C-alpha cells in the first residue's frame, strides 16, 4: 500500500507520513514536469483526468470514455486533449500504456487500452485504500515484473475472451491471468488460458496461499513465487 518509491521503501515512516511524501512526489511531477512544460492552465480539469485514470487502473477505457465521463460531471474537453494528457503522463513516467493484442489476427489494436501506475502508492495516496482495488493492483505488480524481466506486455484478445497479459520477449511468449482468490475465479481464469492452442507457458498468478499446482498445463502460482522466479 505504501509502494516502492526508494525514499519511502527504505525509510521508517508511518502510513500517514509515507503518503505525504508520495503526494509531494506526485505534485512535483505534475506541476514541474507536465503542467508547466505543456502550459496547462486548467489544472483542476487535468487533475480530474489523472484521477480517472488512477481510478481505472487495470480496466480498458478510451479517450471517448473519459470525455463522456467529464461531460457527466459538467466539464468539457476534447478527445484530442485527453490524448495529449495521457501522452504527457506517459512521458513523465506516471502511467504506462498496455495495448491490446488480437491473438487471432496477430495485430496490436489501437483501442480499449489499459494503463498501469508507476507506483501503487499513487492510487492509495490519492483515493484511499479500497479492498476492491486489490485485484487491479495485483495486475499492476505483475505487469511491471514482466516489463522488468524484459518482456513486451499486451492485453490478450482471443475472440471474445480476454487474457490479462501476453508477454513477448524475442522468440519467447507466456500468458498470464491474475486473480486475488483462485477458487472463486478458477474456472474462468483457467478456461480462458486453455482456449489458447499453442504450447507457450500459461500461468494463473494469485494471492491465494493454498493455491498451486498444474491444471491441464496451466501453472497456478502464488504472487510471491512468481515475482521471485528467475525466469518462466
List the predicted regions and their residue ranges.
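Short conserved micro-motifs at the rims of enzyme active sites and ligand-binding pockets
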Residues: 127-129, 188, 214-215, 232
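Non-catalytic C-terminal interaction segments of nucleic acid-processing enzymes
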Residues: 223-232
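Accessory nucleic acid-recognition modules appended to NTPase machines
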Residues: 5, 9-171
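Catalytic cores of nucleic-acid endonucleases
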Residues: 156-157, 180-224
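Conserved beta3 VAIK motif of the Hanks protein kinase fold
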Residues: 176
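Structured loops at beta-to-helix junctions and adjacent beta-edge loops in soluble globular domains
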Residues: 98, 118-120, 179, 205-208
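Internal, well-ordered alpha/beta segment that forms a basic, Gly-enriched binding/recognition surface
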Residues: 2
Amino acid at each position: 500500500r505504501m509502494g516502492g518509491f526508494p525514499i519511502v521503501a527504505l525509510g521508517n515512516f508511518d502510513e500517514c507520513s509515507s503518503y505525504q511524501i508520495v503526494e509531494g512526489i506526485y505534485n512535483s511531477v505534475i506541476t514541474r514536469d507536465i503542467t508547466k512544460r505543456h502550459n496547462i492552465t486548467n489544472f483542476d480539469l487535468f487533475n480530474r483526468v489523472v484521477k480517472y485514470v488512477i481510478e481505472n487502473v487495470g480496466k480498458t477505457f478510451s479517450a471517448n470514455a473519459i470525455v463522456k465521463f467529464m461531460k457527466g460531471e459538467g466539464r468539457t474537453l476534447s478527445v484530442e486533449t485527453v490524448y495529449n494528457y495521457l501522452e504527457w503522463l506517459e512521458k513523465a513516467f506516471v502511467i504506462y500504456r498496455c495495448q491490446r493484442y488480437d491473438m487471432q489476427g496477430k495485430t496490436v489494436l489501437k483501442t480499449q487500452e489499459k494503463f498501469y501506475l508507476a507506483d501503487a502508492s499513487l492510487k492509495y495516496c490519492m483515493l484511499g485504500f479500497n479492498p476492491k482495488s486489490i485485484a487491479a493492483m495485483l495486475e499492476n505488480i505483475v505487469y511491471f515484473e514482466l516489463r522488468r524481466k524484459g518482456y513486451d506486455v499486451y492485453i490478450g484478445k482471443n475472440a471474445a475472451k480476454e487474457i490479462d497479459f501476453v508477454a513477448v520477449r524475442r522468440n519467447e511468449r507466456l500468458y498470464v491471468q491474475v486473480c486475488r482468490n483462485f477458487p472463486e475465479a478458477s474456472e474462468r481464469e483457467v478456461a480462458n488460458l486453455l482456449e489458447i492452442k499453442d504450447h507457450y507457458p500459461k500461468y494463473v498468478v494469485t494471492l491465494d496461499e493454498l493455491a498451486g499446482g498444474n491444471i491441464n498445463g496451466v501453472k497456478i502460482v502464488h504472487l510471491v513465487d512468481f515475482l521471485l522466479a528467475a525466469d518462466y
